[in-house]
Amino acid sequence: MATARASADGVHNAPETVRQSDDKKDITQVERVLSVGDEKGEHADYNRIDQEVAKYAGASEVFVSEEENKRLKKMIDRRVLPIMVITYFLQSLDKGTMSATSIMGIRDDVPGLLSKETFGWLTTCIYLAVLVVEYPTNWILQRVPVAKYLGFNILAWSTVLACHALCFSFPALVAVRTLLGIFEAVCQPAFLIMTGLWYKREEQAQIVTYWYMMNGAQQIVGGLLAYAFSTIRHPSFKANPGNAPIRSWQAIFICYGCISFLWGLYVIFTLPDSPMRAKCWSEEDKKLMVERVRSNQTGLQNKKFRAYQFKEALLDPQTYCYMGIQIFTTLPTSGLGAFYNIIIQDLGFDVLQVQLLAMVLGVVIIATLMGSAWMVKKTKQNLLTMAVFMIPAFTGTIVIMTVKNTNNATKAGLLISYWIIFTFWAAQGLGMSMLTRNVGGQTKKSVCITMNFFAWCAGNAIGPKVFFDGDPRYLKSLSIHLGCYSALLCVIAFLRFNLMLRNKKKDREFGKEISNAHGFDDLTDKENPNFRYVY
């Protein structure tokens, strides 16, 4: 009875704004025979469900066996997951190419790039562009076929990337980098939406980790490829001139652009837009794929804008906590990433050694993200896991700030310390997966994702700008990073306390039994009595 009472309360005791919104009935109604449990309030409210979802969602929860769940997940893993992973890999590779080319002669060929502050703008302008287009991108993603829109943007950014090879002035590079940011802005929001569309709540942390750890994979593969391209020596290459007809940095931009363009075509013709539109599977399988994510309690898709959800997103403290997690992790990440090769070269390594050492950073990032996902799976503790992975970041930063590079031993120690700083990447990945699992209501989720990536962009844009000329040991930059780590720990502590209180309040008011009948009703996490937060 607790379940029935919770479900009924969730529908009948919704905020006044919800009732007023629902009084305006849709012109087209979905006609269905309601289940036996309807009088108990354990059936879906079809006035609130997206009509495309309603064609496949049962009036009440449909049981999907464990065997069926595994079979369906394997089907999704074979079709959707590889595309997400490879797309994110290519996006990370394309975006990170400027760091690889920073020691391949581009700073000598383009006037003004020898200044660290000027060079930093080539990363900053990408994220300023993403910042401007983030909300329009999220708005579009809620209303168009996700796969087709993603594929179009891949084609666009790959073309822009290849055009980098034609740029021999700072304004030209800023222009193409800005366009690159505009078209790549679709990637993470699209993948967060797709993760929620295709995967159950308990699967999402691992899925986000799979595609997000491609940041590390691109360091490994990118390091190898950059090493290979560094052997191309044009007569203009001051460090070691040769007789190649093309500069190494031009070759890498053209090659990566062509590969990404071909991949964009594959995505357009292969990736399903949603479980409801997947032509590659039977109608019965599509119904089961929809039903298996009902328990997420976050909805599937809904094109209707609900003003009260917009307001709730702006007033919800967890929105700003997720923003804090992003800005306090991306600010250090973007700066360290943009100047990675330059920092390692300053330790006394040559160009080819630096390109190979970039691979180790990739291993650290992958190990961090996989390790944090494994720890969450075993302990069910997302925020405590974030805090644990902050310890090496503090340690590595303090060592670099206090130890001078005087011999081979300190050189090796500083290199290792630099690598372990990147363990704070765990907070980025877990923060994004928590957002997809803890925010209900499509309008609210869209606003939260947009604001989350505003913070992500702001951190990435500011990060390279805290590296100053005349600061050879980067003491000012690293001091700012320590401040970010400290602020992040405060955010983690507050968010954990806040979410624990919310769950206890719902347990007291509605009981601990949970019904999934209203999982597609486009209710927010606050108004849905069956919703419980993960922390």
Positions of PLM-derived features:
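Intracellular terminal tails of multi-pass secondary transporters
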Residues: 1-90, 268-299, 303, 445, ...
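Extracytoplasmic gate region of multi-pass secondary transporters
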Residues: 99-100, 308-373, 432, 460, ...
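Central cavity-lining transmembrane alpha-helices of secondary-active solute carriers
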Residues: 123-138, 359-371
